[in-house]
């Protein structure tokens, strides 16, 4: 399997807002992402409980954009298992209750592809979707998966969903032992639209921690599930297994937020169901589908 060389020399964050052309991330991009995941300066801690921490950061050049960073300690979950869970699109449909639809579109290289993901937003906001170029890199016992938004000619914005923009989103998985790891999730996303303050607050105080905990539960159940569902099929580890068609980078273009319709939802009030936690409230995760 081809691999990108991974250097460990420190690098500062690499700017991503001004991206003008579609490129598969290189070594410097992966180092920069790792550096930002590990950075502490400029981040405000908003949640820290039971091994899960959340930080937020306003983007100075555009105050409507916010970065969020979540970190979780995972006991009894090897780094390679968490890496598999994040890659396994069929398993995600089982454990991610927010997903509406998700599928891979095409392969770009042995460690990069293009995919579609749509998700449910807190009521009564409109649901969102995104097309992203995703790339991944094993770095010894650690792993990085990251993505950013692109435009694909066959998948234009849909009328029933708001097309969001991932400026840069990804995961850093760091092994801390044979059966333990730490995962850091870093996201800079333009959800397209003026969101009410309760959405931003709820994302950092409730939604992000809950999503991380649900991912952890899914990791614990993954080995048993995978044994019953094509146990040897892991194209993210064995690219020769990939059934995806190849796609040239020239077929894609960068998805800029300013080219999409802006939705003003700033005055939208939180629904009673969301305030009460809804059917999927804290502590009510339904794991019966993970079998």
From Swiss-Prot:
Keyword Acetylation: yes
A single MF term (Gene Ontology): lipid binding
Any Pfam family matching the protein: START
Keywords tagged on the record: Acetylation, Cell projection, Cilium, Cytoplasm, Flagellum, Lipid transport, Lipid-binding, Membrane, Phosphoprotein, Transport
Residue span(s) of domain START: 14-224
Annotated positions of the N6-succinyllysine modification: 94, 197, 202
PTM annotation (Phosphoserine): residues: 253, 259, 284, 289
N-acetylmethionine: residues carrying this PTM: 1
GO biological process: lipid transport
Biological role: May play metabolic roles in sperm maturation or fertilization. Phospholipid transfer protein that preferentially selects lipid species containing a palmitoyl or stearoyl chain on the sn-1 and an unsaturated fatty acyl chain (18:1 or 18:2) on the sn-2 position. Able to transfer phosphatidylcholine (PC) and phosphatidyetanolamline (PE) between membranes.
Name this polypeptide is given: START domain-containing protein 10
Protein species of origin: Homo sapiens (Human)
Organism ancestry: Eukaryota, Metazoa, Chordata, Craniata, Vertebrata
